[in-house]
Amino acid sequence: MSSFGTARLLISNGGEVALELTVEPWAETHRMLPEQTWAIVTHSPAADGPWSGTLRGDEPFQVDHQPGSVTVWVNGNCFHLSDTEENAIDSADWHCPAQVASS
């Protein structure tokens, strides 16, 4: 049993051109090609949250869309970014717990 809460958000680019994905508050920017789907995973120190929220309390994520870009505000204490096969897109060490592949 883990001692932290985990939240997962899938982001897909269903358009015909690349999108800029920015993960805040780290200002990490990545280019998502058309038809790509990525997972953003974050962790909270407590097993059931709480998440600080951006506009409303207890929300692990906030998503803002602008033409050509998507910004995801992560309200946990770290994040992992991977594709749908759990291959790391951002391998930076954000002091997150090790990811365990799901079966």
PLM regions and their residue ranges:
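Short loop/turn positions at the edges of beta-strands in beta-sheet-rich folds
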Residues: 13-15, 34, 66
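Terminal connector regions
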Residues: 43-103
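Basic/polar N-terminal segments that are highly enriched at the extreme N-terminus
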Residues: 1-2, 103
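Residues that act as N-cap/strand-start positions at coil-to-secondary-structure junctions
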Residues: 3-5, 24-26, 57, 66
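Asparagine-centered strand-capping/turn motif at beta-strand->loop junctions
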Residues: 3-15
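Short, structured beta-strand/loop micro-motifs enriched in basic residues and often containing a Trp
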Residues: 16-23
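Histidine-centered metal-chelating micro-motifs
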Residues: 18, 38, 69-70
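Intrinsically disordered, low-complexity Pro/Gly/Ser/Thr-rich segments with frequent PxxP/GP/PP motifs
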Residues: 24-47
